[in-house]
């Protein structure tokens, strides 16, 4: 089996219409990602959002669609690598597939895994597809909740749900204006239930 130079793999998790494509398009358009070499983008499902040909050309990105989960195996992926010869790989993962069973070629190394979640539909998926959602979240370095405009009061509960599965993940909340700088009570270095709040020197930055 073909085994070439080590490749960095970036996996973007999320259910259909969660905003994965929007996130990847934004990433490809950033100067920090326009590094030497070419990128292979593997789509595991086709959403309504499309990738503009101009962006693909400008970011030196090839794109391939794999809609059959069985084709996402080390042998097939090694053949694809040999065909496209990418320097790095982005996988837009199908949230309905079993991530636990996913195996990559031996020279593919996971560089980063992120999960994108539509905050407006999170309760539905959390209630009805908890095991699939947990599999996406468990090994992700970052969880991005978008479309938070109408669910601001629910964000502390959403955060606790995520932390119950992955305590170390960074959690980002976004609305139509961008990232929400939300400070949660459990992150504060003091107890709000006490009559007197005592700040240590590390706490002053929060009030700045």
Language-model region placement:
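Nucleotide-state-sensitive switch-loop elements of NTP-binding domains
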Residues: 2-112, 116-124
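Short, low-complexity, polar/charged sequence segments that are solvent-exposed and flexible
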Residues: 29-30, 59-63, 110, 132-137, ...
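Residue-level signal for alpha-helical context at structural boundaries
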Residues: 41-42, 131, 158, 180
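Phosphate/Mg2+-binding loops and adjacent switch elements
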Residues: 88-166, 170-173
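C-terminal accessory "lid"/substrate-recognition subdomains
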Residues: 151-208
């Amino acid at each position: 089996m073909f085994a070439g130079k080590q490749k960095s793999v970036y996996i973007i998790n999320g259910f259909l219409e969660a905003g994965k494509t929007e996130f990847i398009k934004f990433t490809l358009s950033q100067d920090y990602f326009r590094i030497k070499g070419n990128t292979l983008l593997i789509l595991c499902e086709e959403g309504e959002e499309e990738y503009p040909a101009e962006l693909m050309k400008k970011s030196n990105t090839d794109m391939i669609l794999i809609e059959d989960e069985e084709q996402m195996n080390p042998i097939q992926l090694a053949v694809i690598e040999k065909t496209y010869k990418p320097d790095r790989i982005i996988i837009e993962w199908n949230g309905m597939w079993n991530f636990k069973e996913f195996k990559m070629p031996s020279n593919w190394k996971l560089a980063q895994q992120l999960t994108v979640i539509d905050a407006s539909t999170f309760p539905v998926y959390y209630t009805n597809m908890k095991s699939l959602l947990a599999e996406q979240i468990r090994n992700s370095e970052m969880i991005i909740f978008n479309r938070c405009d109408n669910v601001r009061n629910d964000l502390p509960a959403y955060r606790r749900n995520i932390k119950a599965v992955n305590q170390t993940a960074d959690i980002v909340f976004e609305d139509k204006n961008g990232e929400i700088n939300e400070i949660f009570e459990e992150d504060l270095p003091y107890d709000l239930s006490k009559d007197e709040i005592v700040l240590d020197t590390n706490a002053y930055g929060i009030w700045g």
